[in-house]
Amino acid sequence: MAETNTAALRAQGERDARALTVTGRRRADTGRIRRAGKALARMARAVTPETPNGQWLRDNRSFACAAAGDAVAALRHARVRASGGQTALGACCAGLLRACGGALTVKAAEAYLEGFQDALPLETAELALLVPGLQAAVVCALAESYAGDSAAAPALFTSLRALGTAAWGMLAERCDRVGRILARDPVGVYPAMDAATRAHYRQTVARLARRTGRTEIEIAEDVLARAQRSEGCLLYTSPSPRD
């Protein structure tokens, strides 16, 4: 799918999200990520001049294995929403990679995530794990590619390297629906905060959502409504869990 076809990417993201049913919480299948990294290392040792895209694997093996390790370290303790036998975050990342044909760009990711979150907004913790989730998706896709014809390998390796750039690090906040709600603060307190303070505030909203059983979107909308009624003062303190 072409990078510039943002409408199609957004529509695909929404379709993918609507196909999911949240069934609880679980940890990511980090064993699958480890196995994919080990498979790439094993296949790299067996590369011959005749191996399709074998040089790509030789040149990038260490980087791919390191990315697999980074993804495992980030994901292994996180309990995020589940859908069937996978996490919603994992399904989102795999769907994005598939929609991009393995060639990730920030522009394409923003379009897909807009559509995905129209149907299923990502939680603060899920957004924080977006890059590790995408690293995991790419590493697993690479292992699958080299188990077949490896045609997708160049695009996948290029995507994996791009995920380490600053542009991808900033993507999560730009796609954060809770932050967008809080940014409508009538006196401009939230938008004036530095990045670390905004992140702390979103984490506070996330904790209140877990404590009360409400969604983060509901908590953020409640905070905004209270701020509008009291000229924004509630955005200087922790949002209240009470209605």
Predicted regions: what they are:
Residues 1-7:
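ATP-binding pocket architecture of kinase catalytic cores
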Residues 86-127, 134-148:
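Active-site activation/catalytic loop segments of kinase-like enzymes and analogous catalytic loops
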Residues 16-83:
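ATP-dependent phospho-/nucleotidyl transfer catalytic cores
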Residues 84, 99-107, 122-130, 166, ...:
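Short acidic, glycine/proline-enriched loop segments that cap or flank alpha-helices
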Residues 73, 83-91, 238:
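Active-site-adjacent "gating/activation" loops or surface patches in catalytic cores
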Residues 150-235:
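Soluble N-terminal domains of membrane-associated systems
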Residues 46-49, 115-119, 177-185:
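Short, charged/polar, low-complexity loop and linker segments
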Residues 236-243:
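Conserved small/polar residues in nucleotide/adenosyl-binding loops
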